[in-house]
């Protein structure tokens, strides 16, 4: 790893220990430090995303002001907003999928212990079990280190963990679509449709596409999102 050759005081593990200690030594995880501070437990449910841009204009033809004060509140008829927030349905379904995976692992662990006591079976893990372990352990490994951090955190610190939540819902949907049961296939299709629809619905907040005040309010489902 190139950067380890530049500073040889720390090895690979020590570098990450220093990074974690740096974050743990900083305090001030509250809105008084920054309005968009979001503790780690707010990330999974997307309760506090982050606004990067908010500008208003009187019409679509009017260029956005590069410098200068914004228009008075309620005066602009067109809103341009960029939010650092994920697709809410993808986010929430991912958390549900992880919970289901945890339940599956717990059930398999209990079943294995019961069968082992009765029949002395050797442990053989299925491919699905390995996938479940991979997703749950990697999600936990990327989220739990932030539990002890007291500095001002933001939603983007969750990016390395949420990837595994996305993979969890993708795996769950794949299982549903490949099921023999019509109801499960319908669940898989419904989840996919809801995620795609939500992406299109919230796309203006990702790309700063023009919105009316009413359209902006429709997308701000919770006051903590603003």
Tell me the role of every PLM-derived stretch.
Residues 52-131:
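Membrane-interface anchor segments at the N-terminal boundary of transmembrane helices
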């Amino acid at each position: 790893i190139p950067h380890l050759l530049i500073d040889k005081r720390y090895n690979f593990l020590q570098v990450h220990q220093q990074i974690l200690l740096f974050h743990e030594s900083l305090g001030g995880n509250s809105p008084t430090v920054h309005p968009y501070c979001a503790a780690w437990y707010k990330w999974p449910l997307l309760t506090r995303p982050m606004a990067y841009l908010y500008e208003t204009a009187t019409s679509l033809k009017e260029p956005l002001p590069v410098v200068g004060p914004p228009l008075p509140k309620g005066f602009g008829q067109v809103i341009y907003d960029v939010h650092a927030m994920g697709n809410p349905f993808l986010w929430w379904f991912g958390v549900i999928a992880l919970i289901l995976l945890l339940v599956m692992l717990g059930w398999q662990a209990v079943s294995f212990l019961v069968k082992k006591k009765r029949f002395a079976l050797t442990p053989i893990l299925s491919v699905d079990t390995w996938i479940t372990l991979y997703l749950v352990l990697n999600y936990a490994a990327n989220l739990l280190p932030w539990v002890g951090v007291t500095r001002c955190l933001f939603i983007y610190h969750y990016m390395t963990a949420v990837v595994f939540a996305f993979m969890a819902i993708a795996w769950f949907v794949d299982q549903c679509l490949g099921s023999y049961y019509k109801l499960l296939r319908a669940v898989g299709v419904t989840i996919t449709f809801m995620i795609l629809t939500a992406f299109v619905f919230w796309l203006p907040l990702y790309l700063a596409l023009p919105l009316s005040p009413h359209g902006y309010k429709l997308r701000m489902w919770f006051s903590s999102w603003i």
